[in-house]
Each structure stands twice: as structure tokens, then as C-alpha cells.
């Protein structure tokens, strides 16, 4: 027998009647628990708030977002710790997706043996590091170009990993 279709996304009902909400992040492959709620609507609203914090404005939610509505009703569904955790996930996913969308730029590393013409030492080193290097080398720094590549492997989600 098939499961009854849920009205909202991001939650389920326990066999004793309470409702639980969790959110999964497809890029980070993480699952974050929002908690246990008395009603399906509260669980769905907690999911929506978490989705907006984790995915930004592109999040798929149960209810339309109203920026003029008071935040007190939704913010009481999520703890401050959970909000911070969701924000960290959002920032981590931005960092993971940003390098793949931008062309790779070579990084320049100081080296006493290799020179790149037209680049001064002042432009490439932070002030404290620059002072240290000038003391060690007497102010004569050379540079070498190094191309840094970042490749990450992602496995596609299997059907049994995706919550419907």
C-alpha cells in the first residue's frame, strides 16, 4: 500500500502522532534536524525558515515568503544555535559553488629564486608578512606563478536518499 501524499515538504509524522522536521542540503550532503512539533503546519513553517536560511531566496518552501510579516512567529520555531548552523551551511555551499563558476586565477607565491617582471613585492604580501620577508631577504623578493586547481567529486543522490 502506498504512503499517503504529504501536504507539506520537509517533515514527517511519528507513529505516536508528533511531527518532526529536517532539511537536507544536496551539495553538502548533510541533514539538519529542526526538531519535534505539535502540528504539521509548525513543522512545515520550521522547514521553510530553515530552507530560506540554508538556500537563500531560491529555496523551495511550503508557504509563500512575506518579508513584511513579523519574524517572531517563525523565529520561535528555530533555536539560535540551529539558525547559526544553517547559516554556516549556506556560507559553505556558497564557497563550494563559487570556485566552479569563476575562471581559475593563478596564485602568486614569493620565492627567492624565481622572478616575474613587473610585479613588486609590495603588491603581493600582507604588511606584517612583507616586513618579515624584507628583513629576511633584505627587500629583494622574487615571485613564481603557480596554478592551483580545485576538483571535488560529488556522487549523485540515490532515489532512496531523497525525501519526498
Swiss-Prot record:
Asked if the keyword Metal-binding belongs to this entry, the reply reads: no
GO cellular component terms listed in the entry, alphabetical order: nucleus
Which part of the chain engages DNA, per the record? 7-64
Its domain of life reads: Eukaryota
**Chief place of localization:** nucleus
Single Gene Ontology MF annotation: DNA-binding transcription factor activity
Please state where this protein is localized.
Nucleus
Q: Which UniProt keywords apply?
A: DNA-binding, Nucleus, Transcription, Transcription regulation
Q: Which cysteines are joined by disulfide bonds?
A: none
- A Pfam family that the UniProt record links to this protein: AP2
CDD domains documented for this protein: AP2
- According to its UniProt entry, what is the function of this protein? Essential for all lupin cells independent of the respective tissue.
- What protein am I looking at? Protein PPLZ02
Question: Which organism is this protein's natural source?
Answer: Lupinus polyphyllus
Give the gene name: PPLZ02
